[in-house]
């Protein structure tokens, strides 16, 4: 298993997802091996290990407004930095809900700050409230935050 150091996603295409993922490596050759593994499992991959533009700037710009993010609600979560924390979140989600935005960057702390955009049908509001309460991770809804409205909200 490899430590995920960064994970950025914004819905932009109904047919395919473009995800910016950072993985911990100790040797440059490991990046090529990881890339081959992704390709072997059917994932199109662009290796950005040596791409300074990606590492210094574009990693912070993944996303923007998306016409596919209608009825999106935005949340900040605090996840424990331990194996299984994200899987617990994903397993608890209803299959009819959609993650339209996801941003995580490992800061070296014992917890991770996650930003998630979720598309949840209005008919599921009660189930969604239960999901948030039983998940047990601290969260803040940011759907009405001015910076969200300026740069991300469709």
Stretch-by-stretch model annotation:
Residues 1-154:
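A conserved regulatory-domain signal marking ACT and ACT-like small-molecule sensing domains
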């Amino acid at each position: 298993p490899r430590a995920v150091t960064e994970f950025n996603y914004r819905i932009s295409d109904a047919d395919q997802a473009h995800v910016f993922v950072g993985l911990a490596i100790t040797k440059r050759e490991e990046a090529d091996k990881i890339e081959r593994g992704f390709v072997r499992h059917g994932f199109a991959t662009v290796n950005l290990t040596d791409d300074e533009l990606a590492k210094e700037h574009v990693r912070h710009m993944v996303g923007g407004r998306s016409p596919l993010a209608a009825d999106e609600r935005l949340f900040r979560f605090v996840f424990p930095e331990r194996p299984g924390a994200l899987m617990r979140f994903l397993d608890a989600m209803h299959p009819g809900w959609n993650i339209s935005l996801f941003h995580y960057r490992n800061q070296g702390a014992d917890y991770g700050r996650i930003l998630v955009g979720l598309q949840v049908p209005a008919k599921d509001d009660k189930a969604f409230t239960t999901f948030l309460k039983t998940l047990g991770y601290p969260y803040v809804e940011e759907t009405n935050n001015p910076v969200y409205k300026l740069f991300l909200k469709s």
